[in-house]
């Protein structure tokens, strides 16, 4: 019974606090992210359940007496057939379909020009037009017999930079800018640790601070002040002297008030000149120190304003003392003075308590709202990490499923000579190594297909040899898996002119089509939202 109203208050506070803060959009975004991540996690859990059901089904079939390897061969053949049908369907969608009637062509306002006629011929040939990508000097082309070496070299460098950025651990490493990938000394770019980059930045800032010329100190000449222009007020000087001389004798105070006393007129001028000459020049502070000083000043200003407001709101005791008349005796006046002082202090304390309660209520409301925001952001981060872990698990399971037949054959051949069950199991586990793909898979792989297309002039080019050896580690990994959202996350950090650059656009298209297998419509929609301009369908001819 006692806990019910407390829970109601906690539920009501965030809804009331929304109009007080401008950070409600972040909470909605975090909640949307959590909803999306939970959906994707549910999908991954369903896939995991399907894989477990499939493995149990295979175990039951083997127990009945069916062949394990024959079932795996049937599964791979069915999967290849499905992929072939999907590829044919995509080609049919991208294929040029001419008009059936001549009247449909005549309905256009203008006749086809020669360029449009050539464009239609290319469409009939099955060439897919991609945004910002060249046609002839391009690694996406089916053949490269008469291509130039320089554009192909730049495209290979951008391809290596993109693959490196997609596969590194972004928590500890980061990539250098894309422009650095075309350096002939280090083609393809390289990764670097975040600690090293921060150290280089600090060293650069120190060097700039050391190289910049220091500001010259300007010594101000002491201004000569005449006695006629300077007429200090006697009253102000007397008051200042009486304030400063708190512990002095009454004779000295009387001497300071006396106008006929002799004063050294030039003493103040000398002190002002000395203070102005000995005043040190203000040194140029660091940006972080300036920011810290501004924050401290702002905090001090706020505290002073709060104190002044509290003093204004509290009732003054002196106004009540002035109302007391001297009609009564000294004792009566003393008693009334004490009672009025007590009443005024109690009223002031009650007012201060009310204001403190209001401020505490607002502070508690702010804390509750901040806690809810922190909970939502932490929940979104947790779901994003769980989603990445689910993707990694799914990729590993797909790789194991893909290599299941080869690994099973290797394990089976290790049991040729049997001696002891435990020894045979240990021997089987030691003999299972990294399985290389068959000839058909290697022929269809993007790396070997790219090597077969490249001209001999490029292969003999010395910087191109370096970039091809760097691409070899990605090409020989037949089980390389990259998710589409990872590609979009890396491309989000690029600038617009980098996305529209022909060399980088070719590398992005190559990774999208041959490695990630991302649909072109999804990438074009993302690119239109990123570039914020309609993409023309006319290719860049180089």
Curated annotation (Swiss-Prot):
Coiled-coil positions: 70-97
Transmembrane stretches, start-end: none
Pfam families: DUF4698 (PF15769)
Region (Disordered): 228-284, 334-358
Keywords (A to Z) from UniProt: Coiled coil
UniProt cross-references to InterPro entries, sorted A to Z: DUF4698 (IPR031526)
Compositionally biased spans, kind Low complexity: 245-261, 342-351
Name of the protein in its database record: Coiled-coil domain-containing protein 60
Native source organism of the sequence: Rattus norvegicus (Rat)
